[in-house]
Amino acid sequence: MVDSQYYLPNDIGISALDCREAFRLLSPQEKMYAHYLSRASWYGGLVVLLQTSPESANIFVLLQRIFRKETPEELEKVAATVGLSSEEYKAFLVYAAGLYANMGNYKSFGDTKFVPNLPKGITTYFSGNCTLEEAELAQRFLDSKKLSAYNTRLFKRNDGGKVCYEVRLASAETSCGTFTFEDKEFIVKRGDYCPLMEKVCFYLQQAEAYAANENQQKMLEQYRHSFNFGSVESHKEGSRFWIKDKGPIVESYIGFIESYRDPFGSRGEFEGFVAVVNKAMSERFTKLVSSAEVLLSELPWPQEFEKDTFLKPDFTSLDVLTFAGSGIPAGINIPNYDDIRQSEGFKNVSLGNVLAVAYATQKEKLTFLKEEDKDLFIKWKGPSFEVQVGLHELLGHGSGKLFVQDHKGKLNFNKDKVINPETGELVSSWYQGSETWDSKFSTIASSYEECRAECVGLYLCLNKEVLRIFGLEGQDAEDVVYINWLSMVRAGLLGLEFYTPESKNWRQAHMQARFVILRVLLEAGEGLVGLKEVVGHDGKPDAQITLDRTKIHTVGKHAIQRFLCKLQVFKSTADVEGGRALYDGYSSVGDSGANNFLRLRETVLLRKEARKMFVQANTKVNGDHVELVEYESSAAGLIRSFTERFQEDADQLEADLLELSKKDTPCWC
């Protein structure tokens, strides 16, 4: 095990998210709306501390109390007097900044614990004594009660020798009911994260007064009801109003959204974002939406496996003002509720100011590429990623149909006519009743879907019309295609950092997906992709990847076409057995065959670069206007942003966090 895997290096990249100009252009009403939504998001984001690990909330409170008493600069003088070197003190600041940026002491991207150096992982979506089989039992119970797992946690208790399962719903209100299911007792309780949910509801109500239209008002009203009573149905209703709110200047979404970090793949991590539309960049995405129906017909599955109607979504480029949670993505396709996405629509967003800094690369830190590829990679990485994100979100996550039989027995497809292209026979399986993609495919659902969306991006970026939409033609267009595919191949190799050999588990959905794609392209053969182990200039193990750009449109396209069709067919037909066999097969990391991936993993760990952290601005009301408070791009700046973020009720908030953490402690001991 490589020790550095569990530390954040002192030279980690820390960048401020620039939203000054976007915020300046907002009207006074829009600024107030953005401010109160940001406050709701930041308080809700503290839930992630309690979702991440038993100790995260306690460490957060400790750091808040330290830095409220003394600024990072003042504390440095104290540290020097007790013998800490400047590098040691910086390491402390980086650790503190890392805890704030990840909302816990596990990396949000990869779920590796960082300092203290303990390799064994934990999750707080389930109490420490819950097994995977019990998670499956709980899912069956939730399905029977038509409850979604998104905003729940599961706790196993022993009451006088009798096993009892407590399902906690995140809400401001408390109480619910007791049920018997499969000879086991289940207690459903409201009130998880109660004081934090109260804060979220308070600020959402404040934001309502500054809503631009009725859709926004009704959306916030439903969100408040959801967070008050733990109702996923209310959150779904709010999401419907959110979809109808076309082209807002201030865009936001909040709730228990992504299930990447739940070991069972059903429970959502809290996140909330507030962002401002970048009109110039959004024009390109609008053109992509206009071409979507034509492009969807080019995807490699039969028409019956595509949605009956493509509901044209909003697709905008946003500059993030606030993103509260454990990490900031480059793009989002939401809501995640399949029933809404299939019949009512969704929205896509690309986070422009995140892209601008997250993927800036220094040549000397570019690993595993040939020297002649590095300058081209640096030049076209940004534009190629913009194309990939657009296709991934809109036509990746936005494509494909799920075959469903509802509670009344009605099917959304003709089971007597639809042929499975993989078997040549009639479709023989589908989703029934309350079954969803997440509940059915559970542990592989997130990564499998990310892989499908990434493959759509690779496949459709070969289309010249797509490239023209992004202003790319001729040699520039070909270079962007090459770098997009090369970037995916490299990302597949880098993904090995997020594989744990001891448990044979992947810790990050996107990186597992990219490794799977690397395996598919290597398997295609014919010299399309090369991967070899070499010795670096420093005399240490290294690796080099190559991609034959002359074979992307032939060998590469055919390989992705076949694989993508299989992914979609297994997903559409709820064929968990077939889908898992396919995906687990390509996800396996071994030391035999043409490539020793276990040894390559050690090389990747040796040469890995830490993921960047972001410093976000705060907003504060001064009289009748809202001010933007910005911070420097450093660990100290990131720390200051958090200590100033919760100044007004710091003592009560910290007491609430400690009480919530204490309440859960018996479940982990």
For each feature predicted by the language model, list its residue ranges.
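Amphipathic heptad-repeat coiled-coil/leucine-zipper-like oligomerization helices
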Residues: P54-V163, V167, R519-K571, R580
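Long, well-structured alpha-helical subdomains associated
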Residues: C19, V48, W437-K440, I444-C451, ...
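Contiguous, non-catalytic segments that form substrate-binding/exosite surfaces or channel walls
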Residues: E88-C176, E182-F385
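Post-HEXXH active-site segment of zinc metalloproteases
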Residues: G400-E449
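N-terminal-proximal low-complexity accessory segments that begin disordered
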Residues: V2-R68
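Short, glycine/acidic-rich hinge or "gate" loops at secondary-structure transitions
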Residues: E214-E221, H235, D406-N412, V466-L486, ...
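Extended, compositionally biased alpha-helical segments that mediate assembly or anchoring
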Residues: K540-C669
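Active-site recognition of the HExxH zinc-binding catalytic motif
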Residues: S27, N213, F385-K408, E425, ...
